[in-house]
Design a protein with these regions (language model features):
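Non-catalytic architectural context of zinc metalloproteases
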Residues: 12, 42, 62-113, 218-235, ...
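Generic detection of long, well-ordered alpha-helical segments
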Residues: 70, 110-117, 121, 252, ...
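Ser/Thr/Gly/Pro-rich low-complexity, disordered linker/stalk segments of secreted
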Residues: 2-66
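Active-site-flanking segments in enzyme catalytic domains
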Residues: 136-306
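Auxiliary, metal-adjacent structural segments of Zn-dependent hydrolase domains
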Residues: 88-161
């Protein structure tokens, strides 16, 4: 007969966590598969991957800026203005529209700037250091206008003192004797300075007292005519005036004489062989020396009088 097994007699199944009574050992844990995480294990958080960065390019070596073209004329102008304390104007943009005495000026061309600026520099360098700064310090700044011509070559240059606090000298390229003209016009600026510095005296009486008896300037008598007193090679001893134009006014007389005082040498013998002209030159030189702080016995205009 089949024997009936009682449910109580069946061997009891053990769990992995129960200890084997026979050996006292715990059963080995059953391996788990990687795709089956334990239900009690914490979930691993998702961490985004860092995208790959491009390799940085090496820093380029800094290059110096490209050199700018040098404006030679403007550099020369700045040098003149800084050294001699005057203003210089040239070119259409700076001189067009300036029409003193109702005249018209024709502007320099760009290729003429440097040449005329160099001539002006060579003229100004003969004056004492700081000489033109005295004009500015006394409220009479001086400006040079460099132009091609004035009124269809009617003038080689002129002095404009419409406003005493803004003296102007216009010089033209067409003048072949630029240094003589420039020094003539500078004399007018000097006399304007002396008019103020010597006030209430004036610089002309002492000078004109040396003229011959009976002489009159054209400004005093439009019919005046004294050619016998004008310097000529065969009239040196009796010369009182350097040129015929010097007989126009006392100011023109002084300017015509001073321009020869500023020459390199006494080419025509005005000061060695003409005693009356020499005497007038000595008065003019002394007045300048006494009223300009920068002037003195070593000033260029004294050379021919020693």
């Amino acid at each position: 007969d089949k024997t009936k097994v009682n449910s109580q007699d069946k061997p009891k199944a053990t769990t992995p966590s129960e200890q084997n009574p026979a050996t006292g050992d715990k059963p080995k844990a059953q391996p788990t598969t990687p795709n089956q995480p334990q239900s009690n294990a914490p979930a691993t958080p998702h961490r985004p991957t860092t995208p790959s960065q491009p390799t940085p390019q090496p820093n380029p070596t800094p290059q110096p800026p490209a050199p700018q073209p040098v404006d030679l004329a403007n550099s020369l102008r700045q040098e003149i203005e800084a050294t001699y304390h005057v203003k210089v104007r040239y070119g259409a943009a700076e001189t067009n529209g300036y029409a003193p005495r109702h005249t018209a000026t024709q502007a320099l061309q760009p290729n003429q700037y440097v040449g005329m600026l160099n001539e002006l520099k060579n003229i100004l360098r003969r004056y004492p250091n700081g000489f033109f700064r005295e004009f500015r310090a006394n409220g009479m700044p001086l400006t040079f206008y460099l132009v091609d011509s004035v009124q269809n070559n009617a003038f080689a240059g002129f002095f404009d003192r419409q406003f005493v606090n803004d003296l102007k000298i216009v010089l033209t390229r067409k003048d072949y004797f630029l240094s003589l003209t420039a020094n003539h016009e500078i004399t007018h600026a000097i006399d304007t300075f002396l008019d103020i510095k010597m006030y209430p005296r004036e610089p002309y009486s002492e000078y004109t007292a040396l003229n011959p008896a009976g002489f009159k300037y054209l400004s005093e008598d439009q019919n005046a005519n004294f050619p016998q007193y004008v310097w000529k090679n065969d009239n040196r001893q009796n010369a009182y005036f350097a040129t015929a134009y010097a007989q126009s006014t006392p100011r023109e007389d002084r300017a015509e004489l001073f321009k020869f005082m500023m020459r390199d040498y006494d080419a025509v013998g005005i000061f060695n062989n003409s005693p009356y002209l020499r005497a007038k030159a000595q008065v003019l030189a002394r007045q300048i020396n006494q009223n300009f702080a920068t002037a003195g016995p070593n000033a260029y205009w004294n050379r021919l009088l020693k």
